[in-house]
UniProtKB/Swiss-Prot annotation:
Cellular-component GO terms for this entry: membrane
Family: Belongs to the transient receptor potential (TRP) ion channel family.
Name assigned to this protein: Uncharacterized membrane protein YOR365C
Keywords tagged on the record: Glycoprotein, Membrane, Signal, Transmembrane, Transmembrane helix
Transmembrane segments: 204-224, 239-259, 375-395, 416-438, 453-473, 517-537, 546-566, 572-592, 606-626
Location relative to the cell: Membrane
Taxonomy, superkingdom: Eukaryota
InterPro entries per UniProt: TRP_C, TRP_Flc/Pkd2-like, TRP_N
Length: 703
């Protein structure tokens, strides 16, 4: 048996029936709620004979409550409770009010992962001290501890204290004693249980950040050293990995009806890929900025500890949520404007109701970011990212200049020294491609919020700017391929023979086959459609889920058909990622209640979602690490890879043009002039197309 027996319901009814959470915020429409403080843990420390930390490793607690009846005759201003199995002690602190004045019968149900695992019915008059029989109108204040018998506490499986993001809650319904058929509920409350374990961890997030950044940095380093093949593959793998992380983060922003706690926690680990990172001083700065630009900031997160539930006392024909309910019961109850609200701008509104936060609002709250600062947070990290790239290029160029002054050999990086401006533009184009999903979604979200005039203008400008930049780059690459194929009969020639064009746009095009560089436009369109669906349709969770599923399905079908990436390994890598993206989108069809399935189905699909994505993330992690290790191990890493069948290597110039080498180093330039003058030799003009026609092994002529 699970916690109902542990709590000895007849003895502690008040803990189950007179609930009110200190932060009455429904984090998503599944009524999952979050508390960032738990004062009873501190109060309990004075009662333990041994160090308190030894007892807090395992516990069940709750400070979250949802009213599941529209005409409940109970309300509470404060509620916290915790059970510690090491000494079988239950601590509680309750401040509640009631207008009931009759004998009450309680029906309590324990629901775990959508299944009713225990039901108990008892009469309040069975309580020994008889304080609640009959129940009288007025205030009720209880604070203390209760010892639970060891025989009862031992019935709780030990795994209950260790399952991360426990999906369990207690539904308590009050009836009049004369209502033997339980047809007219007087009150209903739902209490969420937690054991403090979660799969949301900063350690995982930072490891993924380091892995992704390392992949991109490795690709840049190998590119500067002339290992273009290795650089292209590392960059392609790292970007695909980052896009997978972004897809998980974006899925969490869909405004679904029920998001299992473990799914919400796991996807929160990837919000950094969307620039959603909390830094305290930045949040204070954003608060000031919104106010200074005549905006109306939200104060939900800052006031989370004083928000409360005020239950309306009107007959609204409520529907009680039970274990046998599907998500329709939750959806219908949350459409009641007298009990629930999603209005973030009216503090008087959500101080008297349950504030339902779905999709982007839920993600923002769980990240510790005020909802009116959501766009500014992601936008600021985009600006910081761009500035860091520019600063890194300037510092590296200055460093090379200093080395040259001290006559240190820097010939290995002469390509960067000569073409640093074009390389910087190319890196910025790559950055725009990486963050396009983030900025387009945040900007479209801001269009619907208008936190202030300044933030709206910034959203419009940055959205238009990055869309135009990425679109123009995609079109230029596609037109260059068409022109090359038309004039030379080789789509690769103009794409790879011009150092300026390659340095500027090669970061975008080199991961694709030369005949399939137009796939960049397809990828950009896929990201834009996803951003439109998630950013603009937050009030329509089912439409979002259907649109995302169709978008992923069409993209995957075309990807499998066209196979546009440079080789089989890269195609397989990307197909596997987008296959899982499609499966994840399918899960969210269930979470949106499109099929009106029982809650248990959604709960167990949430577990499958977590294990599937955790295993796949581990596979990607190992795959990328192996690629890094092999690149470092080989002295010439390009020799590991088979030549790409579009003959691009035939048209790639060396590390740099001969003239550029000599002109970059004055001593070599003067030596070259002297040798040519003495020998009367002029540099021959080589037609690479003619040579390629004459030599079947032309693919390796210009390596």
């Amino acid at each position: 048996m699970l916690p109902i027996k542990v709590f000895s319901l007849s003895r502690i009814f008040v803990l189950l029936a007179i609930f009110r959470q200190i932060h009455a915020i429904s984090i998503n429409s599944s009524t999952f709620q979050v508390s960032n403080s738990f004062t009873l843990l501190n109060n309990a420390s004075t009662l333990f004979p041994v160090p308190f930390d030894a007892y807090t490793k395992e516990y069940l607690r709750t400070s979250a409550l949802l009213t599941c009846a529209k005409d409940s005759q109970f309300s509470a201003s404060y509620f916290e409770a915790a059970f510690f199995p090491r000494n079988n002690t239950l601590f509680f602190n309750v401040e509640a009010q009631t207008i009931m004045s009759e004998n009450i019968t309680i029906k309590a149900e324990l629901i775990a992962y959508g299944l009713n695992v225990y039901t108990k019915v008892f009469d309040l008059c069975g309580i020994q001290d008889n304080l609640l029989c009959p129940l009288k109108p007025g205030n009720i204040e209880l604070m203390g501890s209760y010892y639970v018998e060891a025989a009862v506490a031992s019935q709780i499986p030990s795994i209950t204290y260790n399952i991360p993001d426990l999906d369990a809650y207690i539904v308590v319904t009050a009836y009049s004693t004369i209502d033997k058929e339980f047809t007219k509920p007087l009150a209903c409350v739902q209490v969420m249980l937690s054991n403090g374990r979660t799969v949301q961890t900063e350690y995982l997030s930072w490891n993924l950040v380091i892995l992704t950044i390392s992949g991109i940095m490795f690709s840049v380093v190998y590119s500067l050293q002339g290992y273009t093949v290795t650089s292209t593959r590392l960059a392609s793998y790292s970007i695909s990995l980052l896009l997978y992380f972004q897809n998980l983060a974006i899925l969490a922003m869909i405004s679904v009806s029920f998001l299992p706690p473990i799914v919400a926690a796991w996807t929160q680990n990837f919000q950094w890929s969307m620039g959603i990172i909390r830094i305290n001083f930045m949040q204070r700065l954003f608060d000031w900025y919104v106010v200074a630009t005549s905006g109306s900031p939200t104060v939900v997160y800052r006031n989370k500890e004083v928000l409360s539930i005020s239950v309306q006392k009107r007959s609204l024909n409520s529907k009680i949520i039970s274990a046998s309910s599907n998500l329709n019961g939750i959806e219908s109850s949350q459409k009641n404007d007298l009990l629930y609200t999603s209005n973030l701008r009216n503090s008087n509104d959500y101080l008297s109701k349950i504030l339902v936060l779905r999709g982007i609002k839920r993600v923002s709250y769980k990240a510790g970011i005020e909802i009116s600062n959501f766009f500014l947070t992601g936008f600021s990290f985009f600006i910081i990212f761009i500035c860091m790239i520019i600063l890194a290029f300037i510092i590296f160029k200055t460093f090379l200049k200093v080395l040259q002054k001290f006559k240190v050999k820097t010939i290995r990086y002469l390509h960067f020294h000569t073409h640093w401006s074009a390389l910087l533009q190319g890196t910025l184009y790559r950055a725009v491609f990486i963050i396009y999903s983030e900025i387009s979604l945040l900007a479209l979200w801001e269009f619907t919020q208008t936190d202030s005039a300044a933030t709206l203008v910034e959203a419009i400008v940055v959205f238009i700017l990055i869309t135009v930049l990425l679109s123009s780059a995609s079109v230029r690459i596609w037109r260059k391929m068409i022109k090359s194929k038309k004039i030379f009969g080789q789509p690769s020639y103009l794409l790879f023979s011009s150092s300026k064009f390659l340095n500027k746009f090669g970061f975008l095009s080199s991961q694709f086959k030369s005949t399939k560089v137009w796939w960049l436009m397809a990828t950009s369109a896929h990201m834009l459609i996803r951003s439109i669906l998630v950013g603009s349709l937050q009030a329509h969770g089912k439409s979002q889920s259907i649109g995302i599923f169709l978008n992923e399905a069409i993209y995957l079908i075309l990807l499998c058909w066209m196979q546009p990436y440079m080789d089989k390994t890269t195609n397989f890598f990307n197909i596997s990622i987008h296959s899982l993206n499609l499966v994840n989108a399918f899960f969210f069809l269930f979470f949106s209640n499109l099929f009106q399935q029982p809650i248990a189905v959604s709960s167990f699909m949430g577990l499958i979602f977590f294990f599937l994505n955790a295993a796949f993330s581990l596979y990607l992690f190992i795959f990328i690490l192996i690629c890094f290790t092999m690149a470092i191990y080989y002295k010439h890493p390009d020799t590991r890879y088979k030549p790409i069948d579009d003959q691009r290597r035939s048209f790639l110039k060396g590390e740099m043009d001969d003239d550029a080498v000599y002109e970059s180093v004055p001593e070599l330039h003067e030596m070259k002039k002297a040798v040519l003058e003495c020998n009367g030799i002029q540099k021959p003009q080589i037609n690479k197309i003619d040579l390629c026609k004459q030599n079947s092994n032309c693919e390796y002529l210009y390596m």
